[in-house]
């Protein structure tokens, strides 16, 4: 059954990986003897779908692995097409696009409205918001630069508050094979189930480029806690 709690939204059941992680949770025993934790959003914030996807993009076939993710980010108002009928799933993302996505994600979460005023250059209003909200510490030197997976994840990790990125996975420091312990943003996203890596060891490939299709998958997990991935690297 779906539990209820006063002034909180149910985010889903998760295993507690043998740890005490119930600050925002309610523990119970399942019929199989496992401890489950009900996670709650007690902030009153969430991201909801405000549009309908009707196969808008001709380069997103229904058989593609990213189809559902592209449809979802369009419905959330997080991503649009590169053209009216194209999504360009294999294109890399730039710094300006990444800042825009992070700003839009945070504003949608906090206010329910992801719109920004027009500006020149086009990304300026998003950049100003990202700086004011602590998503970025300083303005990037090159807003047109194409980002690596590490660069993208480090920015997205700051887009939502801690209360929206609860730890559901056991990912000890140093357990991601190709990520430094100091890359706390990436570890934060692994622990929250936003990222999981390419294999059972959690390999991240931080220096590889990141595509719009991959970005869509990450944004869906940021927006919808029930879509996050459970795993254990301990």
Predicted regions and their residues:
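Secondary-structure capping and domain/repeat boundary segments
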Residues: 1-62, 68-71, 184
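Feature responds to low-complexity, polar/acidic, surface-exposed segments characteristic
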Residues: 42-65, 80-150, 156-185, 195-209, ...
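PEST-like intrinsically disordered low-complexity regions enriched in serine, proline, threonine
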Residues: 72-73, 130, 189
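Aromatic- and glycine-enriched pocket-lining scaffold segments that form the walls
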Residues: 218
């Amino acid at each position: 059954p779906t539990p209820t709690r006063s002034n909180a939204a149910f985010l889903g059941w998760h295993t507690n990986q043998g740890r005490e992680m119930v600050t925002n949770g309610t523990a119970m025993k399942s019929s199989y003897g496992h401890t489950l934790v009900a996670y709650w959003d007690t902030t009153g914030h969430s991201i909801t779908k405000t549009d309908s996807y009707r196969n808008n993009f001709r380069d997103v076939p229904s058989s593609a692995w990213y189809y559902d993710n592209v449809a979802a980010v369009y419905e959330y108002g997080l991503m649009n097409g590169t053209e009216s009928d194209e999504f360009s799933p294999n294109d890399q993302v730039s710094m300006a696009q990444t800042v825009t996505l992070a700003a839009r994600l945070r504003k949608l979460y906090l206010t329910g409205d992801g719109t920004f005023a027009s500006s020149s250059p086009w990304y300026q209003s998003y950049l100003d918001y990202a700086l004011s909200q602590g998503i970025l510490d300083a303005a990037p030197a090159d807003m047109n630069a194409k980002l690596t997976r590490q660069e993208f994840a480090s920015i997205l990790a700051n887009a939502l508050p801690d209360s929206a990125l609860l730890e559901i996975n056991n990912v000890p420091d140093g357990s991601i094979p190709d990520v430094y312990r100091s890359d706390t943003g990436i570890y934060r996203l692994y622990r929250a189930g936003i990222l999981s890596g390419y294999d059972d060891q959690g390999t991240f490939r931080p220096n590889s480029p990141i595509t719009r299709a991959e970005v869509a998958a990450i944004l869906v997990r940021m927006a919808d806690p029930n879509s996050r991935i459970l795993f254990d690297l301990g």
